[in-house]
Amino acid sequence: MDFDLGADVDALRNELRALVDQHVPDDFLGAFTHDPADLATAQAFCRTLAADGRLCPAWPTEYGGRDASAWEQTAVREEMWAAHEPRGAQYMGVNWVGPTIMRHGTPEQRAQHLPPIAHGEVIWCQGFSEPDAGSDLASLQTRATRDGQEWVITGQKIWTSYATMAQWCFLLARTSREERRQQGLTVFLVPMSDPAIEVRPIASMLGPHHLNEVFFDELRVGDDAVLGPVGGGWQVVQEVLAFERVGIARYARCERLLQWAPVALGDAWERLPEALRTRWTRMLVHCRRARLLAYRVVAQQDAGAVRPGDAAAYRIAVTTLDQESADLLVEIATDTPPGDEGERFRRAVGDHWTYSRAATVSSGAIEIQRVLLARALLADRTTA
């Protein structure tokens, strides 16, 4: 299977790998940490990438990009996730907040929000899930009520990543009651510094304060905070979720760790049971399968439309890959010989395993993805 994306993409990959080697320490814990040292590393690294437009290369130059192809942006995602995501929390703004604002924002919203993202200056969080609205997102209860020239937002969000450090929230709220629950939803861009917002950290196995509850107590915003049409939030969110799912290029991290295994084990690699090495080979094939599905979605995004079934198929493939590769790597890592190389490999595998436990739940439970895929396949058959 040939994934050659051309000389420009290859050159960009080499630049990115050199920058990672130069600026990211070996003990960096990735995007899912609130350690002040890791946060400082990520912020500095984003500014380094942004200096030459490499943080958002596919964006227009007026917003901080360099008018490159969607495939160069894909290469950035892959190289960053392969290196344990040294952009830290800013991957959210780059991968899906920015592209969605570019598609649905007013000229004023694009001018306000896109350059800070492309320059690595701002962190976003996502206000979607609620205590009674996770997989069934359309049942959310956070409401935005019209009061003169303002919207008054009241409600609660949960499992919100990066809320303690974010400057802005991409918030979905209900602005009217309609017969279909997907109607009457609206997206708001709200500042996290407003005193009407309270953040309460939730401890988890991903580390303290990665996940949070967020409470909105009569938060007041104007019409300039509305992204897209009032009542059209569900359509906006469908694009958001497609950007988000393909933006998390975990297959690149899985492949990097799998390729590292023979190096870390050295002579011990040949002594592994043949069945274990066969599983390793098959897992590399699964990485390529996930990459192929991701590229299909990228091509659709580049053409201006994404089929929900294809985004769901990618998400199913990459989350199962995450967990299955983590389990395999844990088995392999038990035979790693002592030494610095082996210790770094074991630490990386342990972190990968910890993250992978939530992979089939976060960003849309795998059961919901299977339903979306099944609906898409049935729809294709009925229209054929």
Label each region the model flagged.
Residues 50-111, 115, 119-120, 162-168, ...:
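Internal helix-loop-helix
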Residues 5-7, 197-290, 359, 375:
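Glycine-rich beta->alpha junctions and the first turn(s) of the following alpha-helix
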